[in-house]
Amino acid sequence: MLFFSLLCTLPSLGRTIDVGKGKAFPTIHDALKSAKPHDEIVVHAEKVYKEHLLIDKPIILRGVGLPIIDGSLQGNVIQVKANDVVIDGLQIQHSARSSRIDYSGLHIENARSVIVRHCVFRANQFSIMFQNSRHCTVIHNNISSNIVQNAIMGNAIHCWKCDDMHIAENVIGHNRDGIYLEFVNASRIEHNKVSGCARYGLHFMFSHFNVYRANFFSHNQAGVAVMFAHHVTMLNNVFTLNRGSSSYGLLIKELQYSTIKGNRFLDNTVGLLVDGGSDLFIKHNEIKGNGWGMRLISASTNDTICENNFLGNTFDMTTNVSYNCNIVNGNYW
């Protein structure tokens, strides 16, 4: 009797629906129309799927052999407007491009618990865009773009008004910004490799209580920027080979109550620029081979800069501020 009761309380498992030549459905669109919540749609890499998809129910959309979904340079390629969706193992390419509208390979809006994993994004204006979403994961994806015109170049991973996002172990290159967060809180960005972006490898604005750790940022034209935020933790990242007249390993602008610890700033024009930082804890960083190792400017107050290694910089540290209660102690020069 107890066994029967347990069976009755278990949720029903979804079906598996195959898409491809000789399968149950020839197109993903038709499979989505037939699918019920929590079904798994398996897309086989037997052709290029020139489709535009709207996912409005909780499903798993999984590719076998990295099938290509091609938007033919029209609109968003895939739109997600449901919770509990998994996008797995697809190549998503050729969204529309516009200087007026932000098109994307994968557009997720007003959703929670969406997972994007093991996908390849190519030649999209924005690759992955989240709006008003939470509890989402972007992991193990490869993202790049061939767009070179600034007016239509978008970001690889773009999050706006989101909470509790996990962005990890992605390889990103050749976008405007690699990872862009605006009004994004309580999120983790870790173990990503971002290089060759036309602006910032990582760009935070108005985003609080976030952690980014063990990321590798190189050859990004403006470096990395964390701006107008508080309670941000930056641990064990590498910022290297970000060079130019307005390029920094890490640019801090109006940041409060944050920790910068265990990072490496290597061979940048400016390793670390702190402009208007207050109550920052900057410790155990390696700042090596930069033009300026660290610049502390403007109204930066109550910052603790201690036990960092400054090695082989043209200028280890420069400042244009008076004392302002900053503590600089125990560094190696």
Q: What are the language-model segments listed below?
A:
Residues T9-P11:
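N-terminal signal peptide c-region/cleavage motif recognized by signal peptidases
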Residues P37, V48-I60, I69-V114, F126-S133, ...:
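Extracellular beta-strand-rich solenoid/capping regions of secreted or surface-exposed proteins
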